[in-house]
C-alpha cells in the first residue's frame, strides 16, 4: 500500500525557528521555577516547616534580602540557555522529522494495528519517544545546568571547558536512566497531545489547530508525561547533582530511596513539578506548535 502523504508539511527552517523561539520564551519566564523544582527533588528527608522550606529553596540566600533571594534562583543561566534552546530545537523540530519518516514508511502498519485514528496518534507518540531517547546526547549540558542549580560546590572554581576536559564521559553518567525516563515521558507528551487533537477536537491535520486547541492538548500531553516519568526523573536528578568525585549509581540511589525514604519518595517534587514544570512544558509546547506553522507561512 502506498504511504499516506502529509499535507501542509512545514519546512525544517520553520520548525527550527519556531522551536528555538519557544525555548527562548520558556527560559525567560521559567528558569527560576525550574531551579526551585530541582532543589526540592534533590532534598533528602521531609520538609516540616516554612523555615526549612526557605532554606531548601534559597540555600545560602535563605536569610538574604528579597532581591538577593530572587537572583539566587538564576544559577547556571548560561548552561540553562544553551541546554534549553538546543533541547527544544531538537525535540520539537526533530519529532516531526521522525514522524514524517514513520508516516512515509509505516503508516499502514500503525493504522492496521491500532486503527486509523489511534494509529495516527500512536505514530506521533512513537516519534516523540524515539526523539526523547536521543536526547541523551545533550546530557553534559543538562548535568552542568542541574549541578549549578543544586550543587554549585561541585564546580570548585572550574570553568565549563575545564570541567569538560576533566570529566569527559563522566558527564554522561546516568544516561541509561535518562533514556528510560525520556522514552515513556516523550511518548506520553506527544501521544497525549495527539490523542486529544484526534478524539476531542476531531482534527485531521494537527498543524491546523488553533492556539486554544494547542494549549488544551499540550496540557493533556504535559500532564501525562510528567506523571509517567516522575519516578525515574527523581533518580536521574539525584545521579546528576552528586559531586563529580563522589558519584552514585542509579541502583544505589534506588535502593537507598526505598530503604530510607519509602516508595513515596519516587514522587517527590511531583506536585510542585506539575504546578511549575507543567506550565513551563505546556507553554513551550503550545508556543512551538503555534509558532512553527506561523513561521512556515511567513517564510514561504
Curated annotation (Swiss-Prot):
Subcellular location: Mitochondrion inner membrane
Keyword Electron transport among UniProt keywords: no
A cellular component term, taken from the record's GO annotations: mitochondrial inner membrane
One BP term from GO: mitochondrial guanine nucleotide transmembrane transport
Family per record: Belongs to the mitochondrial carrier (TC 2.A.29) family.
Full protein name: Uncharacterized mitochondrial carrier C1682.09c
InterPro entries on file: Mito_GTP/GDP_Carrier, Mitochondrial_sb/sol_carrier, Mt_carrier_dom_sf
Keywords, ordered alphabetically: Membrane, Mitochondrion, Mitochondrion inner membrane, Repeat, Transmembrane, Transmembrane helix, Transport
PROSITE patterns: SOLCAR
